[in-house]
Amino acid sequence: LLGLCLITQILTGLFLAMHYTADISTAFSSVAHICRDVNYGWLIRNVHANGASFFFICLYLHVARGMYYGSYLQKETWNIGVVLLLLTMMTAFVGYVL
């Protein structure tokens, strides 16, 4: 599920980026353009927004499973996972702000 969410996020993000304008005066109108004029643009935008939440739910379940089964005893693997979790959170924050 985690991989499926990640692939969905990447694909919908690419489709949204094709129609998005980052200029400060036209950013809002480009989002309105995506929702109104692009075929299934409203669906792509909603899948991208809700897919991010589902991705983090799956990620937290994965961490909880690791804690339940004692995977934290494998120090190197656990530390790499923590670094990846923090990088994912930072990336999501930057994506949300931008």
From Swiss-Prot:
Species this chain originates from: Scaphirhynchus platorynchus (Shovelnose sturgeon)
GO CC, alphabetical: mitochondrial inner membrane
Biological processes annotated in GO: mitochondrial electron transport, ubiquinol to cytochrome c
The protein's name: Cytochrome b
Assembly, per entry: The cytochrome bc1 complex contains 3 respiratory subunits (MT-CYB, CYC1 and UQCRFS1), 2 core proteins (UQCRC1 and UQCRC2) and probably 6 low-molecular weight proteins.
Keyword Methyltransferase part of the UniProt annotation: no
Other information: Heme 1 (or BL or b562) is low-potential and absorbs at about 562 nm, and heme 2 (or BH or b566) is high-potential and absorbs at about 566 nm.
Top-level taxon: Eukaryota
Sequence positions that bind heme b b562: H48
Subcellular location: Mitochondrion inner membrane
Gene of this entry: mt-cyb
Organism phylogeny: Eukaryota, Metazoa, Chordata, Craniata, Vertebrata
